[in-house]
Regions:
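Acidic/His- and Gly-rich active-site-bordering loop/insert found
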Residues: 2-121, 145-155
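Solvent-exposed alpha-helices and their adjacent loops that cap or buttress functional pockets
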Residues: 85-87, 114-115, 152-155, 180-184, ...
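Metal-dependent amide/peptide-bond hydrolase catalytic core
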Residues: 1-9, 33, 70, 194, ...
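Glycine/charged-rich beta-loop-alpha catalytic/anionic-binding loops adjacent to active sites
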Residues: 111-125, 213-214, 388-389
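Acidic/histidine-rich catalytic neighborhood of metal-dependent amide-processing enzymes
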Residues: 121, 129-205, 415-416
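Hydrophobic/aromatic beta-strand patches that form the interior of the parallel beta-sheet core
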Residues: 59, 92-94, 162, 188-190, ...
Length: 416
């Protein structure tokens, strides 16, 4: 069997089993994994049952309940499937996360229905990233089927599926936990992504909670209190002014522009007739790969402290909620990039650029352990196009079919 005919055999197997792949994804979408609250062990159990039908015994690695609850989640089990072929060769891991933000409002399709309309599968996590549970599982199944054919190329090494359930909170209880426990150390990694680019770098993220303390008072005698909300407005204005300055700092990574800051949540006050005594802000600061996280955090704390000092009477507590470092490409990722670009060009009929993304992902945790990695999977050109984290999230099924072929072909290249 020639290499070209091996690629054709992979493609043909995926086409023949594509209806099954769609049903597999529907079954995954139909089990909610809203995070918060993050009660995601039931989804891992369902996934393990589905994988067992393929002849795979998924290892169930339950994170201890106390760790999970201290982290702010409810239940969490990570899965590893290990499929060994001939001796020697690399181990390539494929990682996708099953946790996802709650659906919110405005849906015209059931968020957990997995409904297929006009070639699109709708549902929360259909694009990010239960889609790549399907991409990676069926790419591996296609490789297994090829290996069983007479005259097929000798496949050496192995593939691991890492299906994890902590990406929304930063990944430390997902891939981070598996890596810290010494449960895996692959040679290469492909993580869930989209189909029209291969991502080798991404932004970092700093999330902080800012608590502004004032003094409650009756609204009829406001001079007897200290308005924490007015103090918070001063801090907000300083942060937004700083955000405007970030546009002058640009990244050299294609696909990444400049740093930015978002205040995503504000809580405070007790009633309309009470001067607010406490206000809590939660902010998200995206860091380009060229930035130093320590410097960024120190600068945010400086801006907050200087602003607070201009409003007499308030005190401020600042707590770090999350620090996710940016993804810096490792030199060893070249075989991954080249294979995905080659097969993406063939299957999609267009160039697959090597890009960065303003998102942050679990991939950084693998790279921090020296594991070369890229981000690639089933999905559209942009996050916005997929409606991820918005109503009516969907996946174009032809993207799923083609991305599965690209990943299967890439695995063949890496393991022969």
């Amino acid at each position: 069997m020639t290499t070209a005919s091996a690629y054709q055999a992979l493609d043909a197997w995926i086409d023949a089993h594509f209806d099954e792949e769609v049903r597999f994804l529907q079954a995954l979408v139909q089990v909610p994994t809203d995070t918060p609250p993050g009660n995601n062990a039931p989804h891992a159990e369902r996934t393990a049952d589905l994988l067992q039908a393929f002849g795979w015994q998924a290892e169930k690695h339950a994170v201890p309940e106390a760790e999970v609850r201290d982290y702010g989640l409810t239940s969490l089990t990570n899965l590893i499937v290990r499929r060994r072929f001939a001796e020697g060769g690399r181990t390539v891991a494929l990682n996708a996360h099953g946790d996802v933000v709650p659906p919110g409002e405005g849906w015209t399709h059931a968020p957990y229905g997995g409904e297929v309309v006009d070639g699109k599968l709708y549902g929360r996590a259909s694009a990010v990233s239960k889609s790549d549970f399907a991409t990676f599982s069926f790419a591996l199944r296609a490789l297994e089927a090829l290996a069983a054919q007479p005259g097929a190329p000798t496949i050496q090494g192995g593939v691991e599926l890492h299906f994890t359930y902590d990406e929304e909170f930063g990944g430390e209880m997902g891939p981070g936990w598996l890596l810290r426990q010494g449960l895996t150390k692959p040679d290469l990694l492909i993580a869930a992504g989209f189909s029209y680019e291969v991502v080798t770098a991404h932004n970092g993220c700093l999330q902080m909670e800012v608590t502004v303390h004032g003094l409650m008072a009756h609204a009829a005698i406001p001079h007897t209190g200290i308005d924490a909300l007015q103090g918070a407005v001063v801090i907000l204005n300083a942060l937004y002014a700083q955000n405007a300055l970030y546009k002058a700092t640009t990244s050299k990574v294609p696909g990444i522009t400049h740093p930015y800051l978002n205040v995503g949540r504000i809580e405070g006050g007790t009633n309309t007739n009470v001067v607010p005594g406490k206000v809590v802000l939660k902010l998200d600061r995206r860091m380009i790969p060229e930035e130093d996280p320590v410097t960024v955090e120190a600068d945010i704390r400086r801006v907050i402290a200087e602003a607070a000092a201009t409003f007499p009477g308030i005190t401020v507590d600042v707590k770090r909620l999350l620090l996710a470092k940016s993804l810096q490409p490792l030199p060893g990722n070249v075989p991954l990039v080249e294979a995905i670009q080659k097969h993406g060009q063939t299957v999609f009929g267009q160039a697959i650029p090597n890009m960065g993304t303003p998102l942050y992902t679990d991939v950084r945790l693998y790279c921090a352990q020296g594991i070369p990695a890229v981000i690639y999977g089933a999905g559209p050109r942009t996050v916005f196009e997929s409606n991820a984290k918005r109503a009516d999230e969907y996946l174009v099924l032809e993207d799923l079919r083609k991305a599965t072929k690209v990943v299967a072909r890439t695995l063949l290249d890496l393991l022969t």
